[in-house]
Swiss-Prot record:
The active site is at 18 (proton acceptor), 46 (proton donor). Its EC number is 6.3.4.4. It is found in: Cytoplasm. This is Adenylosuccinate synthetase. GTP binds at residues 17-23, 45-47, 310, 336-338, 418-420. It catalyses: IMP + L-aspartate + GTP = N(6)-(1,2-dicarboxyethyl)-AMP + GDP + phosphate + 2 H(+). It comes from Cryptococcus neoformans var. neoformans serotype D (strain B-3501A) (Filobasidiella neoformans). Homodimer. Keywords: Cytoplasm, GTP-binding, Ligase, Magnesium, Metal-binding, Nucleotide-binding, Purine biosynthesis. NCBIfam families: PRK01117.1, purA. InterPro entries: Adenylosuccin_syn_GTP-bd, Adenylosuccin_syn_Lys_AS, Adenylosuccinate_synth_dom1, Adenylosuccinate_synth_dom2, Adenylosuccinate_synth_dom3, Adenylosuccinate_synthetase, P-loop_NTPase. One of its GO terms (biological process) is 'de novo' AMP biosynthetic process.
Length: 430
């Protein structure tokens, strides 16, 4: 199903990330005029495999650039809420073009987007070392420190690259980090020279971000927004402090792109059929025994950006209800349902209790969250390979029952079901 003829369609991660948003974005982007990123940086990551007329496969890796670029008729936009590491942007751009994907004239970057500098990446690593056993588990791409500079009103934005005062502002920013972390090895003047050289190459891509989006929406363009990370990593609503540094909720779409909330017509929540998480932080349904190991192996649960093993466990509908409440999903994309094919029984978390008392909502206090006793419902498995299913009617009855259980609990319909990694392994229910 294509994005709305007019207005904005948003695809958001509903758990802790790695739900498979890129695959749905790839499908929806085929009918989109504009595909936009609203938050995060090159800490997001997914790979799209495209088969040509001869059956030959080409893999395209996306980290910072919107994956809607796969559609040659789609324009990509990096919004004001994104933090941009310019060398990585051009490295990704050049890699895509070497593989035959023509991007020229189809990519635009908001002049208000903040810049990620080399020293941000160094500081990211220093902070992780400083935290030691309490490490959050960042990708060390400099995303957090860049957002920190932004929040402290000392950051540099894309438009600053063309300001004669850029070198002085850059030196001042580096000196501030030296005072905080000591004098780490960093070539300040070399970085300035590199960025000034990149500035001229970047110039044709730069637009007034809010005006660009306003004109797109008002002219009836079909806009697809590719959310980064997921709700449970949101700075305000995630398991703080084990979160990312940006707003990954529906609110981040509005602020990150500079659009009216009334422009948004569809919000698709992407939910994995079980739960995974990378890095530290609470994970109530995590399974450290056979179930977790099976999900990790069968689901090939390794981080796209870092290669780290993802922690695995049963689907947590308490998390999903909280996520649905905040983001207001109009439909769901249930991914990797095929990973559950081999289980005799499948558990689903339906509630939390602390000292025998049912918990309402999702606890903000991590000490309190650590005490929850997860309440599970047990559903029968289907023990059938569903990877070749093309329609909902082809699913085993127990797989249909699993989908319905999720829908009934959340009050939201499942629109798409992923049954394998391929682009064509996606069942559209309505």
């Amino acid at each position: 199903m294509a994005p709305s003829p007019e207005g904005v369609t948003v695809v958001l991660g509903a758990q802790w990330g790695d739900e498979g948003k890129g695959k749905l974005v790839d499908i929806l982007a085929a009918e989109a005029d504009i595909c936009a990123r609203c938050a995060g940086g090159n800490n997001a990551g997914h790979t799209i495999v495209v088969r040509n007329d001869k059956g030959e496969k080409t893999s395209y890796a996306f980290n910072l650039l919107p994956s809607g670029l796969i559609n040659p008729e789609c324009t990509a936009f990096i919004g004001s809420g994104v933090v941009v590491h310019v060398p990585s942007l051009f490295n990704e751009l050049d890699t895509l073009e070497r593989k035959g994907l023509k991007v020229a004239g189809r990519l635009f970057v908001s002049d208000r987007a903040h810049l990620v500098m080399g020293f941000h990446q160094i500081v990211d690593g220093l902070k992780e070392v400083e935290l030691g056993g309490s490490s959050i588990g960042t990708t060390r791409k400099g995303i957090g420190p860049a957002y920190s500079s932004k929040a402290s009103r000392s950051g540099l934005r894309v438009h600053h690259l063309f300001d004669p005062t850029f070198p002085a502002k850059f030196r001042k920013l580096v000196e501030g980090r030296f005072k905080r972390y000591g004098h780490f090895e960093f070539d300040t003047e070399g970085e300035i020279e590199m960025y000034l050289a990149f500035a001229e190459r970047l110039r044709p891509f730069i637009v007034d971000g809010p005006t660009f989006m306003h004109n797109a929406v008002n002219s009836g363009k079909r806009v697809l927004v590719e959310g980064a990370n997921a709700l449970m990593l949101d700075l305000d609503y995630g398991t703080y402090p084990f979160v990312t540094s940006s707003s990954t909720s529906i609110g981040g779409v509005v602020s990150g792109l500079g659009i009216s909330p009334f422009a948004i017509k569809r919000v698709v929540g992407v939910i994995k059929a079980y739960t995974t998480r990378v890095g530290g932080g609470p994970f109530p349904t995590e399974d450290l025994a056979t179930v977790g190991e099976t999900l990790q192996e069968v689901g090939a649960e390794y981080g796209t950006v870092t290669g780290r093993r993802r922690r695995c466990g049963w689907l947590d509908l308490v998390v999903m209800k909280y996520s649905t409440m905040i983001n207001g999903y109009t439909s769901l994309n249930l991914t990797k349902l095929d990973v559950l094919d081999g289980f005799d029984e499948i558990k689903v978390a339906t509630g939390y209790k602390i000292d025998g008392v049912e918990v309402e909502g999702f606890p903000a206090d991590l000490d309190r969250l650590a005490k929850v006793e997860v309440q599970y419902a047990t559903l029968p498995g289907w023990k059938t390979d569903i990877s070749n299913c093309k329609t909902y009617q082809e699913f085993p009855e127990n797989a249909k029952a699993y989908i319905k259980f999720i829908e009934d609990y959340l009050g939201v319909k499942v629109q798409y079901v992923g049954v394998g990694p391929g682009r064509d392994q996606n069942v559209i229910i309505f």
